[in-house]
Amino acid sequence: YFSMAVILFILFYFNRPFEGEKVAECGCMTDELERELFGHRATFIMDPCDDSNRPVPGLHTNVIRRWGVFPKSLEDLFVKAFSKQSILFPEKRVIDREWMTNIIQLRSMLAKCSFCGEETFIEPDLNNQTCIDCERAISKPMVLKIGTYRIPLFEGQKIYNVHLPIDGDINAVVRVN
């Protein structure tokens, strides 16, 4: 489960989760340092309780730009996945089902801004949201709750089979006749 979290972090943020200031300051990576920095003493670069391994401006530009763009629920899941507890105790790690549920919810929050036409995220429970591109205010939408999913309702929103407790192609759009 841990390697899945690392791969997902790289895909979303274009950076490795433990490569921050500590790795940048390392003159020569030895086997011992690698075990320390990426193993039992690893520190997540966005750990809210430990800023000793923050991304380095000019070096870790992607994660600096992208952290805060994705919804907080995804960031919270990465914080949980790379916490000291998850590193030391495998039973505390985020399992694949939790990742899948979160990413399905994430897809439901992706929308086109009604002002600039660029894609942005609309979080169903937040007030005072802005477009990540043009930074104009987005009205809080009505929300459709299906099981654990909270789907913001906006023009063009799709409900997929995966949102419903039915079998079939999970990417198929639900059609109502």
Language-model regions, residue ranges each:
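Conserved C-lobe activation region of Hanks-type protein kinase-like domains
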Residues: 1-2, 7-75
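Terminal C-lobe "cap" of eukaryotic-type protein kinase domains
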Residues: 75-112
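C-terminal, active-site-flanking charged/polar segments
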Residues: 4-16, 105, 128-140
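Composition- and surface-driven signal marking solvent-exposed, interaction-prone regions
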Residues: 22-24, 94-95, 115, 130
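Amphipathic alpha-helical surface "interface" segments used
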Residues: 27-30, 96-109, 119-126
